Amino acid sequence: MALKLACADFAFPLLSHDHSLDLIAMLGFDGADIGLFEGRSHLWPSRLFGDLKRSARALAGKLSDRGLELADVFLQTAPDFVSIAPNHPDLQVRRQARELFDRTVEFTLECGGKHISALPGVTFATEPESESLDRCRDELAWRCERAAGQGIVFAIEAHVGSIASTPLTAAALVRSVPGLSLTLDYTHFTRGGIADLEIEPLIALASHFHARGARAGRLQASFQENVIDYARVLETMRKVGYTGYVGVEYVWIDWEHCNEVDNLSETVLLRDFLRLHGAGA
């Protein structure tokens, strides 16, 4: 396995986007994970999609100028998980979510990207869980078809608060939708005290990977406090033939204690660890 390292542009929200990309390039990453997070990242879909082609070409140029590949485009349609969830019970909301996804496919294609991540949806308290799940499968299947039609791989991030919040539910969801894969982030499971060995089988279902420190009770922790065995993760990736990027993804937001570590230092520490242990992978 040739280790390909990316870094999230949304790891450094206090910098301008240009300076964030400068920093990622200075740190020697191969690629950048680009966040399209409505209301809370450098790049908002509502601001980009008005002149989509121009916005996409501008981003592609910035990445190229810095020698960075576009590792992933990560769509989040709203600051919360619910209001524009892909499996929302309201048909009009689902149509809005589909339109945003279609535009993201177009944007990614214009940028020269090959991978899109998004959130899977939630379980709605107003209906049986099975209805939320059935609608989720339908919506994700539609997205897989739209992305695959343009040569793009589509993946969901199984996250805290989602309809796929455990390794078992995440695996079941991915396996139930043809063409679907995972943007795998151990930390969303580690936070709940789930052991690495329970998460590890998901690597075989992943097309993208997020890495940062975590421990029980903390979605994001320092490298010193981290309990995830990333050396074993890299070895498992080699065994299963993983070919995607490993994205170092520290975030700085006032949610789940995710503003309590030094993102720059932690990014460097984890980058160096991954390079050391991935050299022979």
What are these regions (language model features)?
Residues 1-6, 14-30, 58, 64, ...:
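Histidine-acidic metal/acid-base catalytic patches
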Residues 11, 36-38, 76-79, 120-124, ...:
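Active-site-proximal loop/turn and secondary-structure-junction residues that shape catalytic pockets
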Residues 13, 48-55, 90-97, 129-132, ...:
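Residue-level preference for long, well-ordered alpha-helices that form the structural scaffold
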Residues 33-34, 70-75, 113-120, 154-157, ...:
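Short beta-strand segments at enzyme active-site cores
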Residues 35-60, 120-127:
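Glycine-rich, proline-tolerant flexible connector loops at the mouths of alpha/beta enzymes
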Residues 40-45, 80-87, 124-129, 193, ...:
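A short acidic, helix-capping loop that chelates divalent metal ions and anchors anionic groups
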Residues 64-65, 80-181, 191, 264-267:
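Active-site acidic/histidine proton-transfer and metal-coordination neighborhood
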